[in-house]
Amino acid sequence: MTNIRKSHPLIKIINHSFIDLPTPSNISSWWNFGSLLGICLILQILTGLFLAMHYTPDTTTAFSSVAHICRDVNYGWIIRYTHANGASMFFICLFIHVGRGLYYGSYTFLETWNIGTIFLLTLMATAFMGYVLPWGQMSFWGATVITNLLSAIPYIGTDLVEWIWGGFSVDKATLTRFFAFHFILPFIILALAITHLLFLHETGSNNPSGIPSNMDKIPFHPYYTIKDILGALLLILALLTLVLFSPDLLGDPDNYTPANPLSTPPHIKPEWYFLFAYAILRSIPNKLGGVLALAFSILILLIVPSLHTSKQRSMMFRPLSQCVFWLLVADLLTLTWIGGQPVEHPFIIIGQLASILYFSLILVLMPLAGIIENNLLKW
């Protein structure tokens, strides 16, 4: 009798994806973050579903409905803070996952990489719209500032902004549509994640050496299921520590003030995971230029595969490229710090230098390091 997991049409798909999947024997803990992203996504969908049962997308009641969730709903506070901090965990895992892809040359799997980039963009849109929903001061002004950026588009900009707003300012129509999109987008993200996995399993996983590992593969279960469970436990431990001890650590105090269109907060800033892009946006004095730099700071990931000049896939044996990579990490941390600072000296010039360095590292220094290393191999 054949095993049901190998013969049943549905279970067979799960078997080929998570049980009998041939996996390189040498993949490190940096490969754990894919499964952690899956856990984050499921967690966000579940907590979001329960929040949506009690939330009202109306400008007059949105703020008080969030307060009601935290005060009156059974364990509402833990659901709300798990959802808010779960987003932070999601982005931490995602940034590490992308960084791993850059370091070990996983971007040579073109379809997987491109779908991953679309995943990132969709997730950023979802998180932005979710931040607007509590209808606090930072929600309202963040929505106003970020949507207003589209007015920099020539000819159609102003009409486009008013079309997105559903009126002449961020108001009830905006909140309602943001709630609708925030609810539906995670399911689109789920579909993207499945497609991402589908393309990955066509080629098989990369590994730290960047060398094809077809001659040395092991089944995913039990080796990597155990490894992923350990990663998941550490993720949940970190998330629960954040939620139970300092749930507002990554939030903004301004968001505990109800939205007031007549009073602008002293420093308008997005959530921490957007600060690097926000710093790039602010570093360019021209509005259209800033918007283009902001878009390109993420879309640049799509052209990374065509900038690969090295004969080796991974950076494991490429010290020059490693230096450039870690310089990029340090630069992104600097941009994140600058994005949260007021627009004044010396932060303006630091932000401008960090922005120039960001694009220079990816567009010039990384390909250059690859060419130099190729020449060093000849010696």
UniProtKB/Swiss-Prot annotation:
Please list the GO biological process terms of this entry. Answer: mitochondrial electron transport, ubiquinol to cytochrome c
Q: Which InterPro entries match?
A: Cyt_b/b6_C (IPR005798), Cyt_b/b6_C_sf (IPR036150), Cyt_b/b6_N (IPR005797), Cytb/b6-like_sf (IPR027387), Cytochrome_b (IPR030689), Cytochrome_b_C_euk/bac (IPR048260), Cytochrome_b_N_euk/bac (IPR048259), Di-haem_cyt_TM (IPR016174)
Record-listed heme b b566 binding positions: 97, 196
Might you report a single GO cellular component term? respiratory chain complex III
The cysteines covalently paired via disulfide bonds are: none
Cofactor stoichiometry and binding?
Answer: Binds 2 heme b groups non-covalently.
Q: Name the cofactor(s).
A: heme b
So where does heme b b562 get bound? 83, 182
Any one GO molecular function term: metal ion binding
Keyword terms, alphabetized: Electron transport, Heme, Iron, Membrane, Metal-binding, Mitochondrion, Mitochondrion inner membrane, Respiratory chain, Transmembrane, Transmembrane helix, Transport, Ubiquinone
**How does this chain sit within the bilayer?**
Multi-pass membrane protein
PROSITE patterns xrefs: CYTB_CTER, CYTB_NTER
Q: Say if the entry is tagged with keyword Transmembrane.
A: yes
Compartments where found: Mitochondrion inner membrane
What is the recorded function of this protein according to its Swiss-Prot or TrEMBL entry?
Component of the ubiquinol-cytochrome c reductase complex (complex III or cytochrome b-c1 complex) that is part of the mitochondrial respiratory chain. The b-c1 complex mediates electron transfer from ubiquinol to cytochrome c. Contributes to the generation of a proton gradient across the mitochondrial membrane that is then used for ATP synthesis.
Q: Give the family, as the similarity comment puts it.
A: Belongs to the cytochrome b family.
Miscellaneous note, as given in the UniProt record, is:
Heme 1 (or BL or b562) is low-potential and absorbs at about 562 nm, and heme 2 (or BH or b566) is high-potential and absorbs at about 566 nm.
Name of the protein this chain belongs to: Cytochrome b
Encoded by which gene?
Answer: MT-CYB
